[in-house]
Curated annotation (Swiss-Prot):
GO terms for biological process: translation. The gene is rpsR. One of its GO terms (molecular function) is structural constituent of ribosome. This is Small ribosomal subunit protein bS18. SUPFAM superfamilies: Ribosomal protein S18. One of its GO terms (cellular component) is cytosolic small ribosomal subunit. Part of the 30S ribosomal subunit. Forms a tight heterodimer with protein bS6. It holds the Pfam family Ribosomal_S18. It comes from Bacillus licheniformis (strain ATCC 14580 / DSM 13 / JCM 2505 / CCUG 7422 / NBRC 12200 / NCIMB 9375 / NCTC 10341 / NRRL NRS-1264 / Gibson 46).
Amino acid sequence: MAGGRRGGRAKRRKVCYFTSNGITHIDYKDVDLLRKFISERGKILPRRVTGTSAKYQRKLTVAIKRARQMALLPYVAGE
């Protein structure tokens, strides 16, 4: 199995949610938006999963951390 994919469908390129919707500022108080980028365990989802660009992934990380600090989002998921 040296290199390449075996059968299956070709991988579709993910599009950045923020650039496609024209969002330039990510607000830490917009909890509903931030929850889309957090796993059910409370972890921040990586770029390769969400498809966000590097610029907006950095802004998203800062916004999520601020929301956690202000107790708008949990650090870990509840039971």
